[in-house]
């Protein structure tokens, strides 16, 4: 009798645990947070060598870290966008070290996505001082730590703001605001696709966060600008938030922008042109936001591959320079509901390789595959061997040799393969 009672009790506990687990998994939680990562005025801007590391003169609009956390009870991820030229992997690792214990998000579930604005803060590049001094000014460890700590603050703030949410994902096209900028191939491909993640509050039914994913260099503002700015990205966020209304936070993730520039629009100055590009992008995102239908729950899968790389000298990086013997980084992918895949590229993927990765995602059964550029690192340009051989501008700042582009593409294919939708067998 005692054995039977023990067996029944064990069965009851097992069923209860399964029920509780299923219940926990059926509740989707989300949170948003942001922080100001604008360094002190006088800090050099990062992006244009023509500035010659001169000190910044002011703040036009704050550069920010904006974090979105999604937790389905099984996987908890943070997507944090920073208005910056590009955080390197060491910075990302420190952000994770600060934010992970405070949020209980696994370190490799924190994704730091640099917008690549050329009007963000400098003085942060520790490796390759010759390049660092030209692009971002003299290294200052206190400024670097400032960026890291402020970005972690955004993630921690989002974690304190968790609520029940629903999620919707979709895509549209922002035509005419980007162009192929490289010299090879002639009339190279442009990807106008806009990916959108919308997160709604269950309580209010209104959006609390919109993530837009679009490929273009935030370089509407030229080297003559000496004030901090998010470039067209800031205008896009502001316009989208006004269009939606309420207490919504818009955030931006760049795509495969390695060979893509914004198309110049009419305007009296760079600010008007930035506003024009940002407003057009926001209008397309708004269309998608209004069209997509939210779900109460989303399945989340992740895949990660650590990479050990070796720098290959170029005309910009001659053999006389001192290089680290190896460089550690990573490449990642996320899938939602076996329908939408996001490949997190640790650098500036070229447009040709972008289409190769997206086509492979479609072949593997994903409804849409998106690229999160400059995510968790900023490795420079990632282009095809053909582009490298034609000595394009991008090839001069392609750090890991002519075969690096195909290597990254193949690693992306393998990540997508690991996450590919499983076909349900009919009985």
Model-predicted regions and their roles:
Residues 281:
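Anionic-ligand-binding alpha/beta catalytic cores of soluble enzymes and soluble regulatory domains
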Residues 9-19:
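Bacterial N-terminal signal peptides
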Residues 1-4:
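N-terminal secretory signal peptides that target proteins for export/translocation
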Residues 20-24:
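Sec/Tat signal peptide C-region and signal peptidase I cleavage site
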């Amino acid at each position: 009798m005692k054995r039977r009672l023990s067996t029944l009790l064990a069965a009851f506990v097992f069923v209860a645990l399964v029920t509780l687990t299923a219940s926990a998994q059926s509740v989707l939680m989300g949170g948003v947070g942001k922080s100001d990562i604008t360094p002190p005025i006088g800090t050099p801007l990062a992006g244009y060598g023509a500035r010659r590391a001169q000190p910044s003169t002011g703040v036009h609009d704050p550069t920010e870290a904006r974090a979105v956390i999604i937790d389905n009870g099984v996987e908890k991820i943070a997507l944090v966008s920073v208005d910056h030229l590009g955080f390197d992997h060491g910075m990302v690792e420190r952000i994770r070290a600060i934010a992970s214990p405070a949020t209980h998000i696994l370190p490799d579930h924190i994704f730091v996505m640099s917008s690549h604005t050329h009007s963000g803060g400098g003085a942060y590049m520790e490796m390759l001082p010759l390049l660092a001094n030209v692009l971002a000014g003299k290294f200052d460890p206190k400024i670097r730590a400032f960026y890291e700590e402020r970005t972690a603050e955004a993630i921690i703030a989002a974690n304190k703001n968790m609520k029940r949410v629903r999620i919707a994902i979709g895509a549209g096209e922002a035509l005419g605001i980007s162009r192929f900028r490289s010299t090879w191939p002639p009339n190279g491909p442009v990807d106008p696709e806009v990916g959108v993640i919308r997160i709604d509050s269950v309580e209010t039914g209104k959006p609390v966060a919109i993530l837009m994913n679009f490929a273009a260099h935030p370089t509407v503002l030229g080297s003559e600008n000496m004030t901090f700015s998010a470039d067209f990205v800031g205008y896009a966020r502001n316009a989208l938030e006004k269009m939606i209304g309420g207490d919504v936070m818009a955030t931006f993730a760049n795509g495969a922008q390695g060979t893509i520039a914004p198309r110049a629009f009419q305007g009296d100055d760079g600010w008007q042109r930035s506003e024009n590009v940002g407003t057009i992008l926001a209008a397309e995102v708004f269309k998608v936001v209004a069209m997509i239908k939210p779900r109460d729950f989303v399945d989340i899968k992740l895949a990660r591959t650590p990479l050990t790389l070796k720098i290959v000298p170029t005309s910009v990086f001659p053999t006389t320079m001192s290089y680290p013997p190896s460089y550690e980084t990573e490449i990642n992918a996320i899938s939602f509901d076996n329908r939408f895949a996001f490949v997190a590229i640790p650098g500036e993927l070229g447009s040709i390789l972008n289409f190769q990765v997206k086509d492979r995602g479609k072949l593997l059964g994903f409804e849409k595959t998106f690229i999160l550029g400059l995510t968790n690192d900023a490795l420079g340009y990632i282009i095809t061997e053909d582009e490298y051989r034609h000595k394009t501008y991008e090839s001069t700042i392609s750090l890991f040799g002519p075969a690096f582009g195909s290597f990254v593409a193949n690693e992306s294919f393998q990540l997508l393969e690991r996450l590919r939708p499983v076909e349900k067998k009919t009985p």
